[in-house]
Amino acid sequence: MKKAGLLFLVMIVIAVVASGIGYWKLTGEESDTLRKIVLEECLPNQQQNQNPSPCAEVKPNAGYVVLKDLNGPLQYLLMPTYRINGTESPLLTDPSTPNFFWLAWQARDFMSKKYGQPVPDRAVSLAINSRTGRTQNHFHIHISCIRPDVREQLDKNLANISSRWLPLPGGLRGHEYLARRVTESELVQRSPFMMLAEEVPEAREHMGSYGLAMVRQSDNSFVLLATQRNLLTLNRASAEEIQDHECEILR
């Protein structure tokens, strides 16, 4: 019993330390790198010279930019043209805020252009990390390939995913996830952030503790995946963990 208690205490200490390290990372100047690129480079260059560089696309009227990430051959980031830190922002549950997940899904075409041929929808995934699961303090959705093992697991659970948020059998990558099936028409009309905040008990008060991902299914529906920070299981809610930036699924 004493050994079990000691092990439990050690796990708590490790979890707290890990959380502290994550927070420390977010307080340095490097955590503002993406925001500076968007607000000080991409946006001014587009407005003054009609050139989105270093971004791949800048849409001031629609409120977003698309940037090629340095990590991985096909990974892109979709980011707002104004200040939003991350999933904890109340702006994400405001109906007037752009539907960033839907916009990010449209931006998947940049992957195909970079690849030189169409990237199948089944190979694409979108993900945003929680407040403690990210390294940047500017809202960004990762547009990248899905891990083959995650793709296989979601395919096997296709019939088990409903239009309500329910635990995904077995979780993903050793962490618990909620899964919800949505149609394309539903996704166009309503942001996944609003679905999470309005449909999962107490989620609205703790949005910053959630990571959120989206994947297309073989029946042309989408599955939303939400994981919540849990220090006892060392889950920082980094939904990006379902992605493979080296795109093994395309080989």
From Swiss-Prot:
Can you name this protein?
CDP-diacylglycerol pyrophosphatase
Q: Which family would the database say this protein is a member of?
A: Belongs to the Cdh family.
Which top EC class applies here? hydrolase
Catalytic activity, EC: 3.6.1.26
Write down the chemical reaction(s) this protein catalyses. Answer: a CDP-1,2-diacyl-sn-glycerol + H2O = a 1,2-diacyl-sn-glycero-3-phosphate + CMP + 2 H(+)
- Phylogenetic classification of the source organism: Bacteria, Pseudomonadati, Pseudomonadota, Gammaproteobacteria, Enterobacterales
What gene is this protein translated from? Answer: cdh
One of this protein's Pfam families, by short name? Answer: CDH
User: Listed GO molecular functions?
Assistant: CDP-diacylglycerol diphosphatase activity
Transmembrane regions listed in the UniProt entry: 4-24
Q: Which domain of life is it from?
A: Bacteria
Signal peptide residues on this chain, from the entry's feature table: none
Compartment(s) of residence = Cell inner membrane
Q: Which species is this record about?
A: Escherichia coli O8 (strain IAI1)
